[in-house]
């Protein structure tokens, strides 16, 4: 058996390392070996991450010992169906190839999806550009409210996650120092509803007129990145040049020691 662990990117404050270690321990108990476990960064349309950022999310040991890949929204997708809103769902093929599909994220209020977390790791997280653009087109036709869990965009995301077979989701609730103060895990739809209710209660500011749900707890200052990091087999995997997952290391970056090229 094999397993993919989908994690959110560096723009989100989720402390993924301790959660990922717990997930890996459960996978080991289920008989999944290390060589059959890999990570995919749910970038959506965000820029690619490099090795130093992989380490900030997962820690040096996990990055050194497991495959870590950026999602690419331009190629290497599997079509799994259309949502009820007629959005074609195309998912990262490296995600679809795994027997077990697990994701880690954070639940915060979100302008378009009501709350982050839940199925948002799939759409937009590991979807194609076409899927994301069709889903995001609803922002021009539908009125949204932050903290509203019943939006067309979330409906699409949940349908997409159900179609592609997301098995398990872990969502963290963070305090103002980006520390975990609660965790919700299980079926992505059920856990997201519970996490969203908890987040709405704890992130809400009551004013004289009406309560307002804040978008997120304050994000702490990002740590200073190291000036350099060891070049290893994982460093080349952050390269954005399109190659199959099994041969993700970019030849020019690996052989010349050059810095991986920035995203287009």
Please provide the spans of the model-predicted regions.
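Glycine-rich phosphate/diphosphate-binding loops that line cofactor/substrate pockets in enzymes
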Residues: 1-4, 29-35, 164, 205-209, ...
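Short, well-ordered beta-strand core segments
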Residues: 101-103, 209, 215, 238
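Conserved phosphate- and dinucleotide-binding cores of soluble alpha/beta proteins
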Residues: 83, 91-96, 101-170
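Histidine-anchored nucleotide/phosphate-binding helix
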Residues: 13-32, 224-232, 238
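Membrane-embedded hairpin module used as a gating/binding unit in multi-pass transport
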Residues: 144-221
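Short glycine-rich or small-residue beta-strand-to-loop segments that form or flank ligand, phosphate
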Residues: 2-13, 38-44, 216-217
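An acidic, phosphate/nucleotide-engaging active-site surface
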Residues: 48-115
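C-terminal catalytic subdomain
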Residues: 220-264
């Amino acid at each position: 058996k094999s397993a993919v662990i989908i994690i959110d990117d560096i723009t989100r404050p989720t402390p993924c390392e301790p959660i990922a270690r717990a997930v890996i321990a459960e996978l080991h108990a289920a008989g999944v070996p290390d060589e059959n476990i890999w990570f995919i960064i749910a970038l959506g349309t965000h820029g690619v991450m490099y090795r130093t950022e992989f380490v900030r999310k997962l820690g040096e040991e996990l990055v050194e010992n497991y495959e870590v890949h950026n999602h690419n929204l331009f190629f290497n997708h599997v079509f799994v169906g259309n949502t009820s809103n007629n959005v074609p769902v195309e998912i990262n093929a490296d995600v679809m190839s795994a027997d077990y599909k697990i994701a880690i994220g954070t639940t915060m209020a979100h302008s378009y999806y009501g709350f982050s977390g839940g199925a948002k790791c799939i759409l937009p997280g590991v979807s194609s550009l076409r899927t994301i653009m069709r889903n995001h087109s609803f922002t021009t036709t539908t009125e949204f409210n932050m903290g509203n869990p019943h939006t067309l965009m979330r409906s699409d995301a949940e349908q997409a996650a159900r179609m592609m077979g997301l098995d398990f989701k872990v969502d963290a609730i963070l305090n103002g120092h980006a520390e975990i103060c609660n965790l919700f895990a299980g079926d992505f739809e059920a856990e997201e509803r519970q996490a969203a209710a908890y987040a709405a209660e704890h992130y809400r500011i009551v004013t004289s007129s009406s309560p307002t749900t804040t978008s997120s707890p304050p994000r702490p200052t990002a740590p200073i990145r190291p000036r350099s990091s060891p070049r290893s087999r994982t460093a080349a995997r952050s390269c954005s040049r399109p190659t199959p997952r099994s041969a993700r290391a970019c030849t020019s970056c690996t052989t010349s020691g050059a810095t991986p090229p920035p995203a287009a």
